[in-house]
């Protein structure tokens, strides 16, 4: 991926694993992250990919003050100059009415996501006239996530978080019961480390400390 990014500039994008033309899950990406040694096999099995969302700089030119519509045009030209299969553009979602956008969010496959629909988290709304602002600006931008799937699961593991959450058990692994050859068994199905308030975090942290049965 580094070899593909040889033009001077600054891209706002997302690091992905794209295998056989399909964007893989975040769990697959985690198998490439934080590796001290990256073997040729790992590079082949987990090829890094960049999906470009915005362009902050083109060469020495700072584009952050330009409206999004102008930055998008520059981004499209920038990615075209890169001319690499390792970098692509986040598709624009056209809509004439709010109901069209609701439908696109609900079914990304019909709104340009194609085979990557299962990996889409939602839609990002940006005012066409908005400048590029640091942090998480409210008003000109809005990240509208897809509705989550809900299941009843068992909290299997809890890990301490990072930064201000380093003193709390804030990273959780959940599992569900399944019938195996040896009888019922718990199988991990996913992880979660956000989606709860600070008050709920304290409640879960206390529960974990009081009910831990094993440590790893």
Model feature map: region roles:
Residues 1-170, 175-216:
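Catalytic cores of nucleic-acid ligases and guanylyltransferases
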